């Protein structure tokens, strides 16, 4: 739900119920195919790294689930960043707070949620919430893996994989509310009887601590070493680069980048994002084209957009549908520069290019810090659209590659389940053996030049020319 402008709230039990329903369907399908559900050796999951819910003693939610799409904490973020503390960057790799950080959501809950202050015992992410409910754990048994831990943004030591008492004290968050930190493959319990009855799966199946979605997608995309790029083309479009640790040039104020710990030991990565990247695509299909529930319509739009020239004839889409951030904190979503000649296909290409323009800025920052970007792997749902992959290749001046398993996180979870139960000894080798390239795109220098010219003009337009217009639009939204 969207109770106020910039607020995005969910019921975390929706995730739980969807998982239980899917597990029951899998059980039925296994039996129909003559396979025994008792052969399932482990349950492993991954989830959103920037989103939390407050829970009580019985592991039941006492707050809404708030994630990275929410920008209600922007004023608080500005107060935190005004402190200009080197501690943030030194321990987390993140020099500045962001409105999407769970650390900021926790501060908001503690200040504004009487329910949490009275009954709350822990803050948890959505995947650990589902996993602990499947295992029938109490609220005080809450956990988080060391990768998703780094999704908090602030409050922890990323290299030591522990909560930071000094940071938490500054943030005003009592460490008693923080979940215990585990390895992703640690066992947290077994499938409880109540969930066994609802799913048809045998009770006692080992349940693992789980991982972050981006971390698993990167592994599923074959990113095992430093200096590799990944475009996670999901609801929140993310552009990631793997590293060996904190790079000071990328962990300074103003870069807009986030630093995280990977699933495997001694693996790290930076990422920048377009919060409404994939969400903007769905919004256009569902609400502008009125094809809600019709996933095939994406193909119709891209087929028509192939006939639209690179740059969309100067038509721009600004993808700030849930509000802006950073220097563009007052920005809002809009189409610009349209004429009577423009149709849904021009608009669709402009939507695809909008995410690419934000990616160009991220790529410029990576390259300026000495990270080479000549080959980028694209994963998740957006990777299926080869037009979008080709557009990104031109805009980023790099080869773009996709793999047959576009949802790499699911396969990666299966591999970790096997690793945790002793069925295999080497995660990297197992993943490398099943990853198969399924398409690539190369940049056209002339189109790359065109996009660079458009990018520079767009940057000036948004940051300079439209700043007053965005402020006026904010005031207009408040008129009732």
Predicted region positions:
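N-terminal phosphate-binding loop and adjacent alpha-helix
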Residues: 1-36
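Active-site nucleophile and cofactor-binding loops and adjacent substrate-binding regions
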Residues: 10, 40-47, 66-69, 92-101, ...
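Glycine/Thr-rich phosphate-binding loops that ligate phosphate moieties of nucleotide
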Residues: 13, 41-82, 115, 137, ...
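A polyampholytic, Gly/Pro-enriched intrinsically disordered region
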Residues: 13, 82-98, 199-202, 227-230, ...
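Conserved phosphate-binding loops in N-terminal lobes of ATP-dependent enzymes
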Residues: 26, 31-34, 39-41, 121-131
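Short helix-loop-beta connector
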Residues: 35-40, 118, 202, 224-226, ...
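Gly/Ser/Thr-rich active-site cleft segment
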Residues: 45, 89-212, 281, 286, ...
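ATP-dependent carbohydrate kinase catalytic cores
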Residues: 155-265, 276, 292-296, 303, ...
């Amino acid at each position: 739900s969207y109770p106020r402008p910039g607020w995005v709230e969910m019921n975390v039990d929706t995730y739980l119920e969807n998982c239980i329903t899917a597990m029951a369907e899998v059980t039925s399908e296994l039996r129909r195919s003559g396979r025994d559900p008792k052969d399932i050796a482990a349950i492993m999951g991954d989830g959103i790294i920037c989103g939390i819910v407050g829970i009580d003693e019985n592991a039941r939610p006492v707050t809404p689930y708030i994630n990275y799409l929410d920008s209600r904490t922007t004023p608080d973020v500005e107060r935190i960043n005004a402190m200009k503390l080197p501690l943030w960057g030194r321990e987390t790799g993140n020099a500045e707070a962001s409105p999407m950080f769970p650390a900021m959501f926790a501060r908001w809950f503690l200040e504004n949620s009487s329910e949490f202050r009275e009954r709350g015992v822990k803050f948890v992410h959505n995947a650990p919430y589902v996993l602990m409910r499947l295992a029938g754990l109490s609220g005080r048994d809450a956990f988080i893996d060391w990768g998703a831990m780094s999704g908090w943004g602030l409050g922890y030591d990323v290299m030591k994989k522990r909560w930071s008492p000094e940071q938490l004290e500054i943030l005003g968050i009592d460490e008693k509310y923080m979940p215990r930190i585990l390895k992703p493959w640690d066992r947290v319990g077994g499938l409880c009887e109540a969930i066994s009855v609802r799913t048809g799966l045998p009770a006692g199946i080992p349940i693992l601590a789980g991982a972050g979605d981006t971390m698993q997608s990167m592994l599923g995309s074959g990113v095992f070493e430093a200096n590799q790029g990944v475009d996670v083309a999901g609801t929140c479009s993310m552009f990631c680069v793997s590293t060996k640790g904190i790079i000071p040039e990328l962990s300074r104020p103003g870069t807009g980048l986030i630093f995280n710990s990977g699933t495997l030991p001694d693996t790290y990565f930076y990422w920048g994002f377009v919060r409404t990247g994939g969400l903007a695509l769905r919004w256009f299909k569902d609400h502008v084209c009125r094809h809600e529930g019709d996933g095939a319509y994406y193909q119709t739009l891209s087929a028509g957009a192939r006939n639209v020239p690179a740059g969309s004839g100067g038509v721009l889409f600004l993808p700030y549908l849930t509000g802006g951030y950073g220097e563009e904190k007052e920005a809002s979503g809009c189409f610009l520069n349209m004429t009577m000649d423009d149709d849904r296909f021009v608009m669709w290409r402009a939507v695809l290019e909008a995410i690419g323009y934000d990616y160009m800025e991220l790529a410029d920052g990576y390259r300026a810090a000495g990270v080479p970007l000549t080959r980028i792997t694209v994963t998740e749902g957006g990777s299926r659209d080869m037009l979008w992959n080709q557009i990104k290749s031109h805009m980023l001046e790099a080869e773009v590659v996709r793999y047959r398993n576009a949802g790499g996180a699911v396969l990666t979870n299966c591999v970790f389940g096997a690793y945790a139960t002793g069925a295999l000894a080497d995660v990297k080798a197992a993943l490398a053996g099943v990853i198969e390239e399924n398409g690539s795109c190369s940049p056209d220098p002339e189109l790359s030049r065109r996009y660079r010219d458009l990018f520079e003009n767009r940057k000036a337009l948004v940051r300079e020319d439209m700043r007053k217009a965005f402020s006026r639009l904010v005031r207009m939204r408040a008129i009732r």
